Amino acid sequence: MQPVCSLVYSLGIASEFAGKRVGATRIYSRLFLISYLSRLLVYSSTRLLVYSSTRLLVYLSTHMIFLPEHLPVAAELRAAGFDVADYPSSGQERARRVLLLNLMPQKLVTELDIARTLAETGQAVHLTLVRLPGQTFKTTPMEHILQFYRELTPEMLAEADGLIVTGAPLENIAFEEVRYWQLLEQAMDEAAARRLPVLYICWAAQAALYHFYKIPKHPLPRKMFGVFEQKVLQPESAAMQGLAPAFPMPNSRHTEVRRKDFPADSGLQILCESEESGIGAAFSEKNNATFIVGHLEYEPFTLHNEYLRDLAKGLPIQPPLHYYIGAPEAGRPDYTWHAAAVRFYANWLDACR
């Protein structure tokens, strides 16, 4: 593996973002090509990964991601050139210990998205897959769950540096009617009591905002579907470092939270917002929790695949907005959110100390 390829890759990512205002319809064809081709060629353990919208800084890293032994997505990451180690393994004691509470039905897809994005930050991460006690699943073989997922316990939360809670396709169900709601509430309360850094994604963000602040979710007249420019409202916040003045973020949801429902005395900070898609992310200093309603972890073709899936089911769906290069039929996504995803997750990992 040649470090120069990694440098080209990193410069490609940084160039996608540095010094440009990220418009939702802007095409980054040349810069995306640099980033994409370099990513296909090689990933080195030496990466330049610190950048901002106004300057480019050099940071060399020799870290890797630690995953459960024989986890299928580990092989995919290795094939893409990522530095992946099975645990237990030497060096893992210096890695950030992150728990992934994966509530999505297609668990392997989400495992890959999260693991890939964490690996792209260049920081050493020990990722543990967890599930709520007694949870069973219909769409992922239980053999996979029993082999790779551990039941979440208070002791695990006490030892962790951070927790990621994914979304779930439960938007049309009242929170209290979700079969594992009480178990999820217990986990959220335990993490908040320890001030463990938690990243709540999409439905989980709405669920946590409802649990802690009674902020309701509101149904949308049609699916919020596409890549939407987020205006950074708190550029000085740790989560938004290097993302101002704006960045693109994929959204795929049927409900939303609204600014008017945020209690004035909650201490919640709205970090970013979109004229089209509404509130993008918020932060609670009290609970040390970040709530993001979009999916920066998505790989380039996720929205396209969701679009084809909904079409095949005969569901009312429009092509994802601000996403395709050319006509939707060509199926050419514009991966404009890649740099923002790496930066956002790097910022969050920095808080996991």
Please report, for each region that a protein language model flagged, where it lies by residue.
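Generic short N-terminal amphipathic or hydrophobic helices
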Residues: 12, 26, 33, 61-64
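Generic detector of N-terminal low-structure segments
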Residues: 19, 29, 34-36
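N-terminal beta-loop-helix "entrance" segment that forms/cooperates
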Residues: 133-146
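Cysteine-nucleophile active-site neighborhood
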Residues: 165-234
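Amide-donor transfer/coupling interface in amidating biosynthetic enzymes
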Residues: 63-134, 149-155, 159, 186, ...
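Short glycine/proline-rich turn/loop motifs
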Residues: 35, 145, 166-169, 328-329
